[in-house]
Curated annotation (Swiss-Prot):
Belongs to the HrcA family. GO terms for biological process: negative regulation of DNA-templated transcription. InterPro entries: GAF-like_dom_sf, HrcA, HrcA_C, WH-like_DNA-bd_sf, WH_DNA-bd_sf, WHTH_HrcA_DNA-bd, WHTH_transcript_rep_HrcA_IDD. Negative regulator of class I heat shock genes (grpE-dnaK-dnaJ and groELS operons). Prevents heat-shock induction of these operons. HAMAP family: HrcA (MF_00081). It comes from Verminephrobacter eiseniae (strain EF01-2). Keywords: Repressor, Stress response, Transcription, Transcription regulation. The keyword Isomerase does not apply. One of its GO terms (molecular function) is DNA binding. PANTHER family: HEAT-INDUCIBLE TRANSCRIPTION REPRESSOR HRCA. The keyword S-adenosyl-L-methionine does not apply. This is Heat-inducible transcription repressor HrcA. Pfam families: HrcA, HrcA_DNA-bdg.
Length: 334
């Protein structure tokens, strides 16, 4: 347990290191506002903080920098998030894929780090199906999921269906099967095909087949924006190994997906510092994440990935407001 003096010094050291990225010495801390301690006393307290694993001394400097453990204590017990107005443009209600891409770009532009959004899992349930004639015996099947995701598939048929038949098939599917999974629709169509006994039965079966394929892709899509922002971060630009590992992480996406999937199980903003998540074992990176909703149901996760030396108070604000903007845009999409 740290006493008030140690907490004050750790807070000042972390804030100073986040601000300029330079190891902080006792003389610098003695000049900090609110610290009325001699350099000798500060050195003694800093030695205690180092023994506790909260700060460390780079080999090239007499100053100290926070460790991941020090950042964690700072974030959990000393960080004050100012609720100052954060200027962020609204996310216009559009196609979900477009809104999600815009959210990732917004995260990266506001943070100047990397913005990440996990798109909602596609549902195998459909909300609406329509048919559009493209040419003779060539038709477009338009499938809308409950989340508003629109999938278009082209089918070729042996019969050149009329517009009236297309409308009839669409009406039958939407009135009888809306809200069911495509596999359920497929089975029910098989049992009812004898009853239907008309040309549109084959059309509906073809639509269900392509719809099942379109909506069965349950792989999470990770949208990443702003990777090049790390080139301007001294923590990475000065170390090619760190930079290479970071870009490998973004390219593979698997670890990011697992980490954000874990964070979706919690309410509010989550912070992962360095390798403490054990999913992304990268001491130089931190992740600030939050879930987002559609009509009150949690459907995905977003976040900012940047250096461990990041202004956590501002990142929390950015992630929180973007989560709310994305939830609003997806829920109010027409």
């Amino acid at each position: 347990m740290l006493d008030d003096r140690a907490k004050l010094l750790l807070k000042a050291l972390v804030e100073r290191y986040i601000a300029d990225g330079q190891p902080v010495g006792s003389r610098t801390l003695s000049q900090a506002s609110g610290i009325d301690l001699s350099p000798a006393t500060i050195r003694h307290v800093m030695a205690d903080l180092e023994d506790l694993g909260l700060i460390a001394s780079p080999h090239t400097s007499a100053g100290r920098r926070p460790t991941a453990r020090g950042y964690r204590l700072f974030v959990d017990t000393m960080l004050t998030v100012q609720r100052d107005p954060l200027t962020a443009p609204e996310l216009a209600p559009e196609q979900p894929q477009k809104v999600i891409a815009n959210a990732a770009q917004l995260l990266s532009s506001l943070s100047q780090f990397v913005g990440v959004v996990i798109a909602p899992r596609r549902s195998s349930v459909f909300r609406h199906i329509e048919f559009l004639r493209l040419s003779e015996r060539r038709f477009l099947v338009i499938i809308v999921s409950p989340e508003g995701d629109v999938q278009n598939r082209v089918i070729f048929t042996d019969i050149d269906y009329s517009q009236a038949q297309l409308i009839e098939a669409s009406h039958f599917l939407n009135s009888h099967y809306t809200g069911l999974a495509m596999e359920q629709v497929r089975e029910r169509l098989k049992s009812e095909v004898d009853m239907l006994r008309n040309e549109i039965a084959a059309l509906m079966q073809a639509a269900v087949n392509v719809g099942s394929e379109a909506l069965s892709d349950v792989q999470d899509e990770v949208v990443i924006s702003g990777e090049r922002n790390l080139l301007a971060v001294s923590d990475f630009s000065s170390d090619m190994d760190h930079l290479r590992r970071a870009f490998d992480l973004f390219e593979q996406k698997t670890q990011i997906l697992r980490l954000l999937d874990i964070s979706s199980q919690a309410q509010g903003v989550r912070i992962y510092i360095g390798g403490e998540s054990q999913v992304v074992p990268f001491e130089e990176l931190s992740v600030v994440s939050a879930s987002y909703e559609v009509d009150g149901t949690m459907v995905g996760t977003l976040g900012v990935i940047g250096p461990t030396r990041m202004p956590y108070d501002r990142m929390i604000q950015i992630v929180d407001i973007t989560s709310r903007l994305l939830s609003n845009a997806l829920s109010h999409r027409k």
